[in-house]
From Swiss-Prot:
SUPFAM superfamilies: Glutamine synthetase/guanido kinase. It holds the Pfam family Glu_cys_ligase. Belongs to the glutamate--cysteine ligase type 1 family. Type 1 subfamily. This is Glutamate--cysteine ligase. Keywords: ATP-binding, Glutathione biosynthesis, Ligase, Nucleotide-binding. Its EC number is 6.3.2.2. The gene is gshA. The lineage of its organism: Bacteria, Pseudomonadati, Pseudomonadota, Gammaproteobacteria, Vibrionales. It catalyses: L-cysteine + L-glutamate + ATP = gamma-L-glutamyl-L-cysteine + ADP + phosphate + H(+).
Amino acid sequence: MSKFAERLQTVANKPEVFQKFSRGLERESLRYTPEGALTQTPHPKALGAALTHRWITTDFAESLLEFITPVSHEVDTLLAQMSDIHHFAQTKLGDEKLWPLSMPCYVGSEEGIVLAQYGSSNTGKMKTLYREGLKRRYGSLMQIISGVHFNFSFPESFWDALFGEQEESARQASKSAAYFGVIRNYYRFGWLIPYLFGASPALCSSFLQGRKTDLPFESIGKTLYLPYATSLRLSDLGYTNSAQSVLQIGFNSIEQYLQGLNEAIRTPSAEFAKLGVKVEGEYRQLNSNVLQIENELYAPIRPKRVTQSGERPSQALARAGVEYIEVRSLDVNPFSPIGINEDQVRFLDLFLAWTALSDSDPMDGCELACWRDNWRKVVLEGRKPGLELQIGCHGEVLTLQAWAKRVFADLRVIAETMDAALGGDAYQAVCAKLETWIENPELTLSAQILAEIKQHGGLGKTGCALGNEYRAVNLQHQYQFYSQDEMEQEVRRSTQAQADIEAKETLNFDAYLTQYFAYLQAVS
């Protein structure tokens, strides 16, 4: 019996393990006008304060909404919460709609993208200044690409089964080590996610704004596409940071990761220094380091812990270890009114359980570079017949199909185990359905949306058609988890909470930033 099979059997003896997976969702979506253009209006007051609202905030731009669910154990509850949030938001948007694709709608110029505003508090001003820095460093267009983030953790019973009884400090160390094992395996095999669920094979030519690219795009009107691409969002055209390529951040342990991250936020950038930090009394960025703050680090998956007041993400991890992981490589699903569906959530359950139960050897920089090259191939040409991927750094290759089948052989066993514990056949059904997509790439989301784009005559028309449909769906939706009263109450609470923060402000902004970044002066 393999170690994977042994570990699965150990966990299977505690069926309650599978009932207590913790999941949360974050979905980004641009507000757009009936004409199909990015909206210029401020974040609607009827949605509450973006700074303090628990479920509805903004990401980079005023027009880029972000919907956040709390943590739940039931898949149905998770999706009901997200549907309710979409319903409430759409009722407050007038004739504006939510863009249903990851790649943005028509953008006349970068200057038309208004940075997200969070009020007059130092916290709020710092959030906007961070975005000003991103704009000056990378341009605004890259920042308004939308995605879905999936937050996930295993219950204590899962770790009990794997590790037995442990003291608290030993348990936390074991959990952190295991989550970093998940992260390494995600880099190794996570290309399956853009293969199956990537949904950005095309973009509007306005997105390039004259930038040169060597990619062999084909065109439909003003839409550019790659025939076998799965996720241009995850390509070099999407959210990546070439300046970060110099960083040496490893994933072999929490200590190695934190050391790399702490070095990164202290690494000066000659390129970003040329932009200036404060010029003629006006701030242009938080600082001129490679990363202004830790959140700027690009990653398809992140180790996370809920932060305490005033705590940076790395401080939270150093204090108490990894609490959950954040999967960040999901495109918005254009065939769902809420950007993700039940099949995807259940597949992620299976896949993340598999990455935790499988062996996960340490990974050096060379190996990580090889895995990243596999990701690059899959996002640009994942549906290409006979596409070969590297197995490590030793010249061995395997077709995507052959490798995916090996993974699904294990996923089927996990699906059987989970269904036996939970009752029904939901996981086996999802596994069987998605396995057919391996030999039939035309069934993948990227192939389906590309077919729609060709049928409609472009990305803009496709997005508008789907956006119209989902506006109606979201408006007609009946609350399943929340209520109108709860939603209105959160609007009032968040608005008051922002006012309270602003009223208590005592430091001027310069002093606040000096205090916040005091850690950069400290010895790491």
